[in-house]
Amino acid sequence: MLGAIIGDIVGSVYEWNNIKTKDFPIFREDYFFTDDTVMTCAVAEAIMNGGQKDDFIDAMKKYGKMYPDAGYAARFSSWINSDNRDPYNSFGNGSVMRVSLCAAEELVNVHIIPLNDYSCLVLDRLGNIIEKID
């Protein structure tokens, strides 16, 4: 999540003024967060609230209203401020810009389960060693 947010902030000044170099400052005073950061935070809240469809809709509308000038596309902005909870036929790539947390949430189990098994084995062995020392 932090990587996505940092990337959004560092890239903010180049969003409409693309550059073709890897030589650019990491820290500038004119950097700012965009709608992608706001909606990434909304996705995080939605996942923490259960990760169901309504959780995502509620969080996106909430965060969109909290940060109305973050740079949303016209259709998304209209959707945020409407009572409509259905898809709004976006032509943009915004959903791709904030989906990283969904993959991270899914990969947690893939990553943790093998590590937990290994950790249990290590702790078991340490416990056996400690018992032998006592």
Describe the residue ranges of each PLM region.
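Structured, active/binding-site neighborhoods that engage oxygen-rich ligands
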Residues: 1-134
